[in-house]
Amino acid sequence: MLLNILDIQAKKGLEKIACLTAYTFPMARILDEHCDLILVGDSVGQTVYGMESTLSVTLDMMIAHGKAVVKARSKALVVVDMPFASYYTPELAYKNASRILSETGCDAVKLEGGVCVAEEIAFLVARGIPVMGHVGLMPQHFNQLGGYKCQGKTDSSRQHIKEDAKAVCEAGAFCVVLECISPSLAAELTQELPVPTIGIGASNACDGQILVVDDMLGQSSRYPKFVKRFADLEHTIKDAVVGYVRAVKCSEFPGDEHCYSDGPHLRVFRAHPHHAQ
């Protein structure tokens, strides 16, 4: 049964909400069985396309990856990030968010920002588009924030984040991501806000957690401090590639068990030449 935003909200204070990012059909199919929420994050720009930041990610890219993820899910709620500069007015936000929902079949969109995007969030929610908020460290704002740094360390910054989170909730966001803020601030916001908080580098005090799946799986040697690597796929993949190349060079692969024999199997192969492509 597909989860909806009410199911996610009902977990607040009762059951931790497990979230991960996904950008492809195979990965989403694996995550769907276990995760409550899958985010098609604009982090795809860095993890898949090798971009320096999320600022170059386009709406078409998000829609393409959103389609792939939605096709794989049978249970998890799917949220798609709205990319940089795609929601700087209420009308533009609605135009792009409605396209994301209609073309991907996802359940909600995510916007970064607090007070500055409250009007856009309210505009979308009033027109039937569920919104996930995102405050604290906001990757689309990294130039203004002076880089990827923990936020809320000063009294003024702490107050600013609290105002942002409150504005997002009052505008109608069904949950809010808290990124790279202190544990005490995360605990305070989780207690005060009426909607679930999803932490990333924001301590275990939040109602749920999210990580970039590539970081969690250890597919890169570079990852933030707040990431726990539950696997080491970078070395697993390297070992597999080395083994494959060695087997090819030594003529150990393909073996007889990987080859077609004369007879019916050969006729099938010739009738379906696309198998060789």
Swiss-Prot record:
Keywords for this protein: Cytoplasm, Magnesium, Metal-binding, Pantothenate biosynthesis, Transferase
Residues annotated as the enzyme's active site: E179 (proton acceptor)
Annotated residues for binding of 3-methyl-2-oxobutanoate: D42, S43, D81, K110
Catalytic activity: 3-methyl-2-oxobutanoate + (6R)-5,10-methylene-5,6,7,8-tetrahydrofolate + H2O = 2-dehydropantoate + (6S)-5,6,7,8-tetrahydrofolate
Name of the protein: 3-methyl-2-oxobutanoate hydroxymethyltransferase
GO molecular function, one term: magnesium ion binding
BP term (GO), one: pantothenate biosynthetic process
Natural source organism: Anaplasma marginale (strain St. Maries)
Keyword Transmembrane: no
Gene Ontology cellular-component terms listed: cytoplasm
UniProt cross-references to NCBIfam families, sorted A to Z: panB, PRK00311.1
Keyword Magnesium: yes
Entry EC no(s): 2.1.2.11
